[in-house]
Amino acid sequence: MTVKLGFVVAEFNRDITYMMEIEAREHAGFLDAEVADTIYVPGAYDMPLAIKKLLERGEIDAVVTIGCVIEGATQHDEIVVQHAARKIIDLSLEFGKPVALGISGPGMTRMEATERIDYAKRAVESAVKMVQRLE
């Protein structure tokens, strides 16, 4: 069975999320998974609605989120990631389908974010493994 993935990709810090998306797509191909649809959103905080839209489509087996939240002068990065992660978990449970957290951050510098680009592959792997193990 080919696992059909939906990607939700944040455009904020696009220089980094673009590279994360490329890594994720390549790894999906390596795992014989298909990226059936991709929705681009402004930032990580905007992901839950796009995730819900993908999960409502019956053909999507799992969703992979791709985002990068870099530390700023305030705690904004922590708030964004905490709330996005909580809602992402809620949507996974509501729809009974895996939603892999491929959002790097909070509390990291741009350099650290660049070093963690390959974390997107881990999110793809998590999504595919969960679909296979829950069948």
Curated annotation (Swiss-Prot):
Residues spanning the signal sequence: none
A Pfam match: DMRL_synthase
Keywords: Riboflavin biosynthesis, Transferase
Residues that bind (2S)-2-hydroxy-3-oxobutyl phosphate: 73-74, 116
Residues that coordinate or bind 5-amino-6-(D-ribitylamino)uracil: 12, 44-46, 68-70, 101
InterPro entries: LS, LS/RS, LS/RS_sf
Domain of life where this protein originates: Archaea
Pathway entry: Cofactor biosynthesis; riboflavin biosynthesis; riboflavin from 2-hydroxy-3-oxobutyl phosphate and 5-amino-6-(D-ribitylamino)uracil: step 1/2
Keyword Transferase annotated: yes
Enzyme Commission code(s) on record: 2.5.1.78
GO cellular component terms given for this protein: riboflavin synthase complex
GO BP: any one term: riboflavin biosynthetic process
Gene Ontology molecular function: 6,7-dimethyl-8-ribityllumazine synthase activity
Active site: 76
Catalytic function, reaction form: (2S)-2-hydroxy-3-oxobutyl phosphate + 5-amino-6-(D-ribitylamino)uracil = 6,7-dimethyl-8-(1-D-ribityl)lumazine + phosphate + 2 H2O + H(+)
Primary enzyme class: transferase
Family note: Belongs to the DMRL synthase family.
Function description: Catalyzes the formation of 6,7-dimethyl-8-ribityllumazine by condensation of 5-amino-6-(D-ribitylamino)uracil with 3,4-dihydroxy-2-butanone 4-phosphate. This is the penultimate step in the biosynthesis of riboflavin.
Protein name: 6,7-dimethyl-8-ribityllumazine synthase
Taxonomic source organism: Methanoculleus marisnigri (strain ATCC 35101 / DSM 1498 / JR1)
